[in-house]
Amino acid sequence: MNPEPKALSLIVYDFDGTLVNTLADITDSVNLALKELNLRSLSREIIRAYVGGGMHRLMEQALNGTGYDDIKHAVTLFRKHYGDHLLDQTEFYPNTRETVEHFSNKKNVIFSNKPAAFIERILNALDFRHPFHAVLGGDSLDTRKPDPSGLHLLMRQFNCSPEQVLMVGDSAIDIETGKRAGVWTCGVSYGLGNSQALQESQPHYMIDDLSRLKALLK
């Protein structure tokens, strides 16, 4: 069953791996933190598998097997380096701008496990804060995805019922979040998330380019 396009009033986007490709800058920042701790570096593909669960989870996995267990300090180091290298190589995925702007008749929001301040900095630097009616980051609430509390908050804020909401993301975490909130879900296959896990999460839609949302929801 497909959502009735006229009924959809709120589109909720994940950030990393959905709207922007941040992998290179995240990888460099993780490795700078690891270097400062005199630990081995990790490849981009390894770190790619760690993105999506928030900074604490990212560094917890990056430290796995090293014997170093001060995750809080590692997160502090990562945050410092990432703040310095946030926009070195980060860029929008193809067709992101035009697709989000196409849905200007709906509410467009971001719901990510990334700290909200980093999201805001990237959007402002890329001159694309204006289309989004709200930004929820991993530190905006006491919970993070896949907990659906953020979606519940957004539905209350914009006076939407679940059938009026579409959650778009590149990971199984995003799809699980949407399903737990009872909203429509759309997976994007071009992002950073594990493609097999994304498929197995069984989103209502699966697209290989964000612009395909326009045809799905026309």
Predicted regions and their residues:
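Helix-loop "lid/cap" segments that line or gate small-molecule binding pockets
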Residues: 33-34, 54-68, 122, 154-155
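Active-site neighborhood of HAD-like aspartate-dependent phosphohydrolases
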Residues: 2-49
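Short helix-capping segments at alpha-helix termini
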Residues: 35-40, 66-69, 127-131, 159-160
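An amphipathic alpha-helix signature
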Residues: 27, 31, 44, 48, ...
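Metal-dependent phosphoesterase signature
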Residues: 60-101
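Asp-based, Mg2+/Mn2+-dependent phosphohydrolase catalytic module
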Residues: 1-9, 45, 120-218
